[in-house]
Amino acid sequence: MTKYKLEYIWLDGYTPTPNLRGKTQIKEFASFPTLEQLPLWGFDGSSTQQAEGHSSDCVLKPVAVFPDAARTNGVLVMCEVMMPDGKTPHASNKRATILDDAGAWFGFEQEYFFYKDGRPLGFPTSGYPAPQGPYYTGVGFSNVGDVARKIVEEHLDLCLAAGINHEGINAEVAKGQWEFQIFGKGSKKAADEMWMARYLMLRLTEKYGIDIEFHCKPLGDTDWNGSGMHANFSTEYMRTVGGKEYFEALMAAFDKNLMDHIAVYGPDNDKRLTGKHETAPWNKFSYGVADRGASIRVPHSFVNNGYKGYLEDRRPNSQGDPYQIASQILKTISSVPTEKKAVA
C-alpha cells in the first residue's frame, strides 16, 4: 500500500468570479486511485461564501482525477460542491447542471498576465514599457524577460504530466501577457481540465513570488490589450454535415441570444469588448471569415470545407467560467434544427 497525497480542489462561492480552493488529505491505495475509489470529503463553507457559520458543512464530491507531478505520490482531485446530504448540488455548483455532449469539442485559449509588485511583469516602476508590437510570440529578454518562459514551460510540463490536453503556449500582445490552450471532448471534460490548468498555474507561481492576473482588462482604458478566453467549438453535426444554410441559421441564433452569452462570458467584458484591440463591441453580434474583430471568427478552413468544422467565439474573457461558457454555446446550438442526414 502507498500513501497518496490527495489535493481536493473546488470552486468557492465568491461572485461574480469564483476562486479555486484546495486542501490535502492522505489516503492509502494499492495503486494510483481511480475516481470511484475517492471518498467524499467536507469543508467549512462559511469561510468560502458557501454557508453560514451556524450550519457550515459542505461536501466535496470528486468528479475528475489527475496525477500531480509536483508532489511525490500526488493526486489532483477536481470536485463539485454538494449540500450536506452529499447528493444535492450546492447553489454555487454550476458544473452539476450544465449541458454536456461528448460529441461537442471545445478548445479554450486562456490569456492572462504575470503580475509582480502590483504591475505586469516587465513593466517599469512608473509609466509603461515600449508600445505593443514586439511582445506577441516574441523571444529575447527585452520582450519576455527572464522568468516568464521558465514558468510557462514548467506549467506546460505539469499539465502534460497530469494528462491534461494542453495544446500550446505563446507570449501575447501585451508585455507580461501569455496564453495557453486546453482542448477537451465534452463541455465538462474541457472545463474540468481548464480549471485544473488554472489551478496548476496559480500554485506554480507561488514559489516565484508572482501573481496571475485573470482580469479581462487589468490596464484599463489604455492602448494595451485585454485578456480573453476564446472558445473554439464544434459539434459532430458541424464537423460532418454542416452547410452554409445551417451555418447562417446558427449565426442567427447566436445573434438572437447575444445577451445570454454575454451574461456568462465573464465580468467587466464591456471594458474589454470595445471594438478595439481585436474585439467586437459587447452589445453587437458579428461574424466574419478570419476576422479577429468579430464576435465569432470563421476560419478559412471552415468555409473551404463546405461550412464544416469549428468556429471561434472570441467574446469569452479570461475570468469566464468554462462550465457556463460551454453550456451556453451548446444551448444556443441546440436551438437550431438539424437535418436528419446520414453521416458518411
UniProtKB/Swiss-Prot annotation:
Cellular component per GO, a single term: cytoplasm
Keyword Cytoplasm: yes
Names of required cofactors: Mg(2+)
Cellular location(s): Cytoplasm
Domain GS catalytic, residue spans: 89-344
Residue ranges of domain GS beta-grasp in the record: 4-86
Annotated residues for binding of Mg(2+): E109, E111, E172, E179
InterPro entries per record: Gln_synt_N, Gln_synt_N_sf, Gln_synth/guanido_kin_cat_dom, Gln_synth_cat_dom, Gln_synth_gly_rich_site, Gln_synth_N_conserv_site, Glutamine_Synthetase
Keyword entries, A-Z: ATP-binding, Cytoplasm, Ligase, Magnesium, Metal-binding, Nitrogen fixation, Nucleotide-binding
Class of enzymatic activity (EC top level): ligase
The protein's Enzyme Commission number: 6.3.1.2
Reaction equations catalysed: L-glutamate + NH4(+) + ATP = L-glutamine + ADP + phosphate + H(+)
Domain of life of the organism encoding this protein: Bacteria
GO annotation, biological process: glutamine biosynthetic process; nitrogen fixation
Binding site for L-glutamate: E278
Keyword Magnesium carried by entry: yes
Residues given in the record as ATP binding sites: E167
Gene Ontology molecular function: any one: ATP binding
Residues that span the membrane, as ranges: none
Family according to the record: Belongs to the glutamine synthetase family.
Note: Two forms of glutamine synthetase (GSI and GSII) can be found in this nitrogen fixing bacteria, GSI is a typical prokaryotic glutamine synthetase whereas GSII is similar to the eukaryotic enzyme.
PANTHER family: GLUTAMINE SYNTHETASE, GLUTAMINE SYNTHETASE 2 CYTOPLASMIC
Protein task: Catalyzes the ATP-dependent biosynthesis of glutamine from glutamate and ammonia.
Quaternary state and interactors: Homooctamer and homotetramer.
Name assigned to this protein: Glutamine synthetase
Lineage per the UniProt record: Bacteria, Pseudomonadati, Pseudomonadota, Alphaproteobacteria, Hyphomicrobiales
